Regions:
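Bacterial N-terminal signal peptides that target proteins for export
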Residues: 2-8
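Bacterial N-terminal signal peptides
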Residues: 10-19
Length: 477
């Protein structure tokens, strides 16, 4: 998070390491990102000055890249007052520094207002098709199923936008909720909308390419749900991507309470319409499996490194594929005051068997690169995103020793490195398949908690639990 400590001056950190074992004694450089601008936490001086919000008051962010830069459209929220309705818009040239653009719409479109009585617009998504931008938005009130997903169109990403009315409506007695749209084109060129929140779960419906609205009547097909009795049906914020390398569709959703224990889950499928299964082969529609919190591979929940305040309730994500790089975009709340929501952008990496994993640190311009093994030994903070933990997962100490052994609060074991980016941690006291082996990727990062460049790692253990780590100090001898 934004540290209370002083952030280091802007600089490019280069470590010149004598790469032991490399022929010719050549040196290897690890390039760390420059210091990003820190946004002060809980800064009441900017409450009524949107131009100074930067990443403040960002909720349910949907991202799109255009020729003019990166744009994020997000839910109308504001700490300390009522937000102006109309879908908030921000812009960036680098995914790090964000500028306020304004509201996409002049207010709540009349049809949406009449149907729902909404006071703000939620969870937008923007796509570009055949020279036209299409903005999908949600109108509802908290806890209601009297909801509507609408659409507006424009020739320009910054508008003006022309409202096209309802895409899908639900009534208070319908079994599902028409909010949280995400529009995705499959690998065959067909367009779909995935949507839904709590109540009847997540549905997918095919859209007419020419209109951007459903091709047929009805609500579409159910692709994710949770048990109403034990979990209140708490699943929302769906987002689907297709990874050409693995020939898989990936469904991201958020579980639980957006103010308390929000967390991001993922499952995948050969088909855009499912079934979507998690790391352990459980279908996302399996509401009978117990415990329900083990359905869906948990990529990220609340977390806390060391003595830092940490973050709670990260969720409602979108995903950006930019060239060969993937990024996850989501909001999170500071632990000290959950009323404030902040925009986070993180690098997304992929395991060898095709599962996404997330950087422990927010993006600051780092690039994936080979890491010299000589600098891995040292003190680390390691963190498990245990699906059983509702609140913050807290880090614990991990020491990687030069002889290939490791020690920590988790126990003892050994580590090996492939000479490039993959680090394998094997614990002596765990059963195979129960978290014994953790396969993680090492990458440079900006350590927001203390300031400065640092190595980090991210991956999954053999039970599908997400593992994060960051280096605190190195053992040089």
């Amino acid at each position: 998070m934004m540290s209370k400590r002083k952030v280091l001056p802007v600089m490019l950190l280069l470590m010149m390491i004598g790469a032991g074992g490399c022929s010719g004694g050549r040196t290897t450089e690890v390039v760390f990102p420059e210091s990003p601008d820190a946004t002060a936490m809980y800064d009441t001086t900017v409450l009524h000055n949107e131009a100074k919000w930067t990443v403040n008051n960002a909720h349910d962010p949907g991202i799109i890249k255009t020729d003019q830069g990166y744009y994020i459209f997000s839910t109308d929220v504001k700490v300390g007052g009522e937000p102006k309705p109309g879908v908030m818009v921000r812009k960036s040239d680098d995914l790090i520094h964000w500028k306020w653009v304004g509201q996409a719409l002049p207010g709540i479109p009349q049809e949406a207002l009449d149907w729902t009585g909404a006071v703000n617009l939620w969870a937008p998504d923007v796509v570009h098709y055949d020279g036209e931008y299409r903005l999908y938005y949600s109108a509802s009130t908290f806890g209601s199923r009297q909801s509507m997903i609408g659409m507006a169109v424009s020739d320009s990403i910054e508008g003006p936008w022309s409202d096209q009315g309802a895409v899908i409506k639900t009534k208070s007695d319908d079994p599902l909720n028409a909010i949280d749209p995400n529009v995705v084109t499959d690998h065959e060129g067909r367009m779909w909308m995935v949507y839904g929140s709590f109540f009847g779960g997540i549905h997918i419906i095919e859209l007419d390419l020419s209109t951007g609205k459903p091709k047929e009547e009805g609500f579409g097909k159910l692709i994710a749900a949770r048990d109403m009795a034990s979990e209140d049906g708490a699943v929302e914020g769906p987002y689907i991507i297709y990874n050409e390398k693995f020939k898989q569709y990936y469904l991201f959703v958020s579980y639980d309470s957006l103010f308390e224990d929000y967390n991001v889950r993922v499952a995948r499928s050969d088909s855009i319409t499912g079934p979507y299964v998690d790391f352990n082969g459980r279908e996302m529609t399996d509401t009978a499996f117990e415990p329900q919190f083990e359905v869906g591979t948990k990529l990220m929940g609340g977390y806390k490194f060391g003595e830092d305040e940490g973050w709670i309730a990260p969720g409602h994500n979108s995903v950006l594929k930019d060239g060969e790089n993937y990024y996850i975009v989501h909001h999170a709340r500071g632990e000290a005051d959950k009323n404030w929501s902040y925009l986070h952008v993180r690098k997304m990496l992929w395991t060898e068997n095709g599962w996404p994993v997330l950087s422990p640190e927010r993006y600051a311009g780092e690039t994936e690169q080979d890491i010299p093994e000589a600098i891995l030994a040292g003190e680390w903070e390691r963190l498990e995103h245990d699906p059983f933990v509702d609140g913050q997962n807290e880090s614990s100490k991990l020491t990687l020793l030069k002889d290939g052994s490791m020690e920590g609060s988790r126990g003892s074991g050994s580590w090996i490195f492939d000479g490039k980016r993959t680090l394998t941690l094997t614990w002596d006291d765990a059963e195979a398949g129960g978290g014994q082996v953790e396969t993680v990727q090492v990458l440079p990062a900006w350590e927001w908690e203390r300031g400065g460049g640092a190595l980090a790692f991210t991956g999954l253990n053999d039970g599908g639990i997400a593992i994060w780590g960051k280096q605190i100090s190195r053992i040089s001898k």
